[in-house]
């Protein structure tokens, strides 16, 4: 059992234990490895203690750590790097990271990677605020405080000194907002008074507030195996989730250099240069408009998938972070079946992405030997993402290269139009509009918004202004929904984002010409339009059916959004039923006669936007004059 601690936890530990007159005390990091039995004491690093064959934990006195820490950094770093036996012994170890925040977890993961330690399982636990003092009291007599090990990471790469160990005194923020720790269960052993590994059972009076979530440690850390080379981990902190779905996951985070907040979108890809996903990047890079979410940059990072990591496409990120109860842009379903040979264990899908599933095949010949493999199925490609083999507790690792595309964008702090509409359906004015991630408005005051007819018109007008610009640059968005329209200013500064389904007008035109002039079979047409693309309630019939279409399809979506804002549905079922009816009838009068009577001019404009593809106007044919919107004469020369 190898035990360590880190600088971030030391500072919090010292502050919490000051009331108890317990100098430097903190949580430990345990390495429980079956190969440690034969280790010699002389071959161990001086900064670790081996307790595999002893019930009593050996400790190292660090009372003078604050004065001697700087002198021992280089020695400790050399001991870690040069001790090959320790590295080999840890190859099949179970590592439990016990820490205060995700930055602490990342730093310790850096240490493992920097030391050349390869492990088969990494688990972590986060200690809640309420339990820290009690835990400190219980662990005071036995936990090792080896701050120098974590500090050695600072000296391992002088050029990256500031990037790898940025703490910024944000520990209190991390306690509330950071990555949730993970482990199947937890225990506080009365005899050894140490936090056990992830697989132990919960058993202690002081463990009431030890937080743990189902085993997702590999997911939270598999992107950090080469953390020193991760731009995202080195340049951003205060990470929390804004939303997620089939497209990937979007984080709110703070850049450690300019101290500005950004939205960073992460998309898992199978190749280093993902042509399809880069369409979104290229679209955003070419667009510069006040009503479009600003693009700052993008990059690709390589990750290592091991035998304990979750399936590449089946990643369930809502276990990794706190306060992400709902994201309306995605839906998830889970199916499980017991069978001796195979089972379909998960399925993740949404209205604008292909279904992707994780397929598990299990077989066993005896109680002591079993194997399993999982495969990622998506877009017609099959790739192995996980294989495990258990033979008398010996694990074989399969490492496979995967990549993540990161897109750094402007952060819209107030809300999405979806959240705004949902709130308005229940109350006519909103106090302090916040997104699903509870982002307070930047000026710290309440925002009073009433979604009256004037506001509905202004939102619609700004969306059309943005679409005019997008279309003029040769792009079609294809997914204009309330979820992709962001409220970035008070009272209403509307911006369009999420260009994940954007394509060029030229590609749609080429496809149309191929189908009409050459009678090419759609199944063999590489540029063919896919039916069902987009979000069903907001996509036009021609786009839904995969017929020939162009930038006019975005105008149908705008008409539906305008209709929804005026209708103010009280339930999700009412919204779904009514918008489906509008999609079939293409008439406000046939869908909601009362609304037609209440807002005759506005509903006439909606009818103009949602009419059939052949007669629907282009965006540059619609007047967006502020004083005369919606226009009475719908078309302009």
From Swiss-Prot:
GO terms for molecular function: ATP binding; eukaryotic translation initiation factor 2alpha kinase activity; protein serine kinase activity. GO terms for cellular component: cytoplasm; cytosol; nucleus. The keyword Nucleotide-binding applies. InterPro entries: CC_SR_Kinase, Kinase-like_dom_sf, Prot_kinase_dom, Protein_kinase_ATP_BS, Tyr_kinase_AS. Keywords: ATP-binding, Kinase, Nucleotide-binding, Serine/threonine-protein kinase, Transferase. ATP binds at residues 242-250, 265. GO terms for biological process: cellular response to amino acid starvation; negative regulation of translational initiation in response to stress. Residues 36-88, 155-234 are annotated as: Disordered. It catalyses: L-seryl-[protein] + ATP = O-phospho-L-seryl-[protein] + ADP + H(+); L-threonyl-[protein] + ATP = O-phospho-L-threonyl-[protein] + ADP + H(+). Residues 53-85 have a biased composition (Low complexity). The active site is at residue 479. Its EC number is 2.7.11.1. Residues 236-629 form the Protein kinase domain. Pfam families: Pkinase. It comes from the Eukaryota. Belongs to the protein kinase superfamily. Ser/Thr protein kinase family. GCN2 subfamily. This is Probable serine/threonine-protein kinase DDB_G0283065. It comes from Dictyostelium discoideum.
């Amino acid at each position: 059992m190898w035990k360590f601690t880190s600088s971030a936890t030391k500072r919090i530990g010292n502050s919490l234990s000051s009331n108890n007159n317990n100098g430097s005390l903190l949580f430990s990091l345990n390495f429980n490895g079956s190969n440690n039995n034969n280790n010699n004491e002389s071959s161990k690093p001086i900064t670790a203690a081996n307790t595999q064959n002893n019930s009593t934990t050996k400790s190292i006195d660090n009372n003078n750590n604050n004065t001697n820490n700087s002198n021992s950094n280089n020695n400790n770093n050399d001991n870690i790097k040069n001790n090959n036996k320790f590295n080999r012994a840890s190859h099949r170890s179970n590592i439990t990271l016990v820490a205060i925040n995700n930055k602490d977890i990342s730093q310790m993961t850096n240490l493992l990677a920097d030391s050349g330690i390869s492990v088969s399982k990494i688990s972590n636990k986060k200690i809640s605020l309420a339990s820290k003092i009690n835990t400190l009291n219980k662990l005071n007599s036995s936990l090792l405080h080896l701050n120098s090990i974590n500090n050695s990471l600072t000296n391992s790469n002088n050029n990256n000194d500031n990037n790898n160990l940025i703490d910024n005194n944000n520990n209190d923020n991390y306690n509330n907002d950071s990555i949730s720790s993970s482990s199947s269960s937890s225990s506080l052993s009365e005899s050894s008074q140490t936090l056990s590994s992830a697989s132990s059972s919960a058993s202690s009076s002081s463990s009431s507030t030890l937080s743990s979530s189902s085993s997702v440690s590999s997911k939270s850390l598999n992107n950090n195996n080469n953390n020193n080379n991760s731009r995202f981990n080195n340049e951003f902190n205060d990470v929390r989730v804004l939303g997620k779905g089939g497209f990937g996951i979007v984080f709110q985070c703070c850049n450690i250099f300019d101290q500005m907040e950004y939205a960073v979108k992460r998309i898992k890809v199978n190749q280093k240069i993902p042509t399809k996903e880069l369409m979104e990047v290229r679209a955003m890079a070419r667009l510069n408009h006040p009503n479009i979410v600003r693009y700052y940059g993008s990059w690709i990072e390589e990750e290592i998938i091991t035998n304990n990591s979750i399936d590449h496409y089946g990643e369930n990120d809502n276990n990794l972070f706190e306060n992400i109860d709902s994201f309306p842009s995605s839906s998830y379903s889970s199916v499980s079946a017991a069978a001796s040979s195979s089972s379909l264990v998960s399925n993740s899908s949404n209205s604008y992405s292909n279904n992707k599933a994780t397929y598990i095949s299990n077989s066993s010949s005896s109680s002591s030997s079993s194997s399993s493999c999982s495969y990622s199925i998506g877009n017609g490609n099959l790739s192995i993402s996980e294989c495990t083999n258990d033979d008398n507790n010996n694990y074989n690792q399969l490492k496979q290269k995967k990549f993540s595309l990161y897109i750094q964008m402007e952060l819209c702090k107030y809300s999405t139009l979806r959240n705004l509409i949902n709130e308005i359906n229940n109350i006519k004015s909103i106090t302090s509009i916040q997104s699903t991630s509870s982002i307070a408005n930047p000026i710290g005051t309440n925002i009073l918004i009433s979604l009256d007819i004037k506001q509905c018109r202004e939102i619609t007008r700004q969306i059309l202004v943005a679409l005019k610009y997008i279309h003029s640059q040769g792009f079609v968005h294809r997914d204009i929904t309330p979820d992709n329209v962001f409220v970035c200013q008070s009272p209403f500064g509307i911006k369009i984002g999420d260009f994940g389904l954007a394509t060029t007008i030229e590609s749609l035109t080429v496809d149309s010409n191929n189908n009409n002039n050459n009678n090419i079979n759609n199944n063999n047409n590489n540029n063919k339009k896919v039916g069902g693309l987009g979000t069903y309630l907001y996509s036009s019939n021609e786009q839904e059916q995969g017929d020939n279409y162009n930038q006019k399809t975005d105008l149908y979506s705008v008409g539906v959004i305008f209709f929804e804002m005026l209708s103010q549905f009280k339930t999700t079922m009412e919204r779904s039923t009514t918008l489906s009816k509008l999609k079939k009838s293409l008439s406000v009068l046939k869908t909601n006669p009362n609304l037609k009577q209440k807002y005759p001019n506005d509903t006439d404009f909606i009818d103009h936007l949602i009419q059939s593809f052949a007669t629907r106007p282009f965006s540059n044919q619609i007047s967006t004059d502020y004083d005369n919107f919606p226009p009475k004469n719908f078309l302009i020369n």
